[in-house]
Swiss-Prot record:
Cofactor(s) the protein requires to work: pyridoxal 5'-phosphate
Principal EC category: transferase
Enzyme Commission number(s) from the entry: 2.3.1.47
Source species: Paracidovorax citrulli (strain AAC00-1) (Acidovorax citrulli)
Annotated residues for binding of pyridoxal 5'-phosphate: 115-116, 186, 214, 246
Reaction(s) this enzyme catalyzes, per UniProt: 6-carboxyhexanoyl-[ACP] + L-alanine + H(+) = (8S)-8-amino-7-oxononanoate + holo-[ACP] + CO2
Protein name: 8-amino-7-oxononanoate synthase
UniProt family annotation: Belongs to the class-II pyridoxal-phosphate-dependent aminotransferase family. BioF subfamily.
Length: 412
């Protein structure tokens, strides 16, 4: 009998495959980070002003959250010890679920340890073989993977094209239809037309799953999210909408939740494998998030400051981008996409900013479509007016590189 004492032979292919990623500027690299003050970080030993964090309200380093985490650890310890349906559902986690449901004004909430696991779990719990799922072309990877895992028939409609979505819904013979969409699209920052999505789901008897990872805490009255901003809360919303949001962005901590009607949340509790078979999040995190919800609810000044920084950046870049092939998207949110195009040019822009002490990540395919590599500028209430002015000045310094790459008639 043949034996193979060494590593599997197919692993020999991996160095060449990694080299292929290098050749097309697609290999990802991690940075080692330590927080300093405000939006400033120590990145691989270098001080940087960061425009890459999803900590939109600047709460991740808030003393009230640190105090709540310490108090939670003293009360409950640091681990949950089991899955939620065995021994891991602490009093703190139960209280957080009640607080989350109240905050987003829906009947019931279910708390998960991670956003990615939430969507990859709840989608297969809702639809399966023989059912129809309708997905925006620019949805986040977790919704895409959840759709694939469900084995439902997937209908992918062009980004934001709700006429195309309606045609697909009208043509579908499936009894169970699920529409899934980001509320705020993570790489462009644009906001879905939630009212029209809801109306289409009512018209065609579909359920709407809305992923508000980048809107929760920032959009809507008192930061209650994109669904509340659209005026969809309470009983009417819960009959047709399943609302999902993450807690590691504007909330400043970690985890995620889904909220909806009593019966829908009970079904997900019974059928979501990523909830049933995963160790529950520790109670100290729930206590942290309860403190965060209070800060979000009282955080109108933070949101106003963030809105001012968004307006400052957008106004400041208008003259900078004139005559270049770089394009700033139309986002009104904290996610601002500066589309550059080629992978190598986006990487060069990122490195030029790093040399100036600014950390703005270059996002490349497959995260974004081919030919749309970009700088993803993430703004935060932790940024000052001077911080944003510094970024605008730095982009003005490096933008001529883009102009020089244009044909003469385009650069004129």
């Amino acid at each position: 009998m043949t034996t193979f004492p060494f590593a599997p032979s197919w692993l020999d292919e991996l160095p060449a495959r990694l080299a292929e990623l290098d050749a097309v500027h697609l290999r990802r690299r991690r940075r080692t980070v330590r927080p300093l003050q405000g939006a400033h970080l120590d990145v691989d030993g270098q001080p940087m002003l960061a425009f890459c964090s999803n900590d939109y309200l600047g709460l991740a380093g808030h003393p009230a959250l640190a105090d709540a985490a310490c108090a939670g650890a003293r009360e409950f310890g640091v681990g949950s010890g089991g899955s939620p349906l065995v021994s891991g559902h602490s009093q703190a986690n139960a209280a957080l679920e009640a607080d989350l449901a109240r905050f987003v004004q829906l009947p019931r909430a279910l708390y998960f340890y991670a956003g990615y696991a939430t969507n990859t779990g709840i989608v297969p719990a809702l639809v399966g073989a023989g059912d129809a799922l309708f997905s925006d072309a620019l949805n986040h990877a977790c919704l895409i993977d959840g759709a694939r895992l469900s084995r439902a028939t997937i209908h992918r409609y062009p980004h934001g094209d709700l006429a195309a979505l309606e045609a697909l819904l009208a043509a579908s013979p499936a009894r169970r239809k699920l529409v899934v969409s980001d509320a705020v699209f993570s790489m462009d920052g644009d906001v879905a037309d939630i009212r029209t999505l809801h109306a289409l789901c009512e018209r065609h008897d579909a359920l709407l799953l809305l992923d508000d990872a980048h809107g929760f805490g920032v959009l809507g009255p008192q930061g209650r999210g994109a669904l509340a901003e659209a005026g969809l809360t309470g009983q009417r919303a819960s009959q047709r909408v399943l609302y999902m949001a993450t807690l590691g962005k504007a909330a400043g901590a970690a985890g995620a939740f889904v909220a909806g009607s009593e019966v829908l949340i009970e079904w997900l509790l019974q059928k979501t494998r990523s909830y049933i078979f995963a160790t529950a999040a520790p109670a100290l995190l729930a206590r942290t998030l309860q403190a965060s919800l209070g800060l979000i609810e009282r955080g109108d000044a933070l949101r106003a400051h963030l809105d001012a920084r968004i307006a400052q950046l957008r106004a400041g870049l208008v003259p900078v981008l004139q005559g270049t092939h770089w394009e700033l998207g139309t986002s009104r949110t904290a996610v601002q996409a500066l589309v550059i195009g080629a992978n190598d040019e986006a990487l060069a822009a990122m490195e030029a900013l790093r040399a100036r002490g600014l950390w703005v990540p270059a996002i490349r395919p497959p995260t974004v479509p081919e030919g749309t590599a970009r700088l993803r500028i993430a703004l935060s209430a932790a940024h000052t007016e001077a911080d944003v002015a510094r970024l605008v000045d730095a982009l003005a310094d490096i933008a001529p590189t883009a102009r020089s790459a244009l044909p003469q008639e385009a650069a004129a």
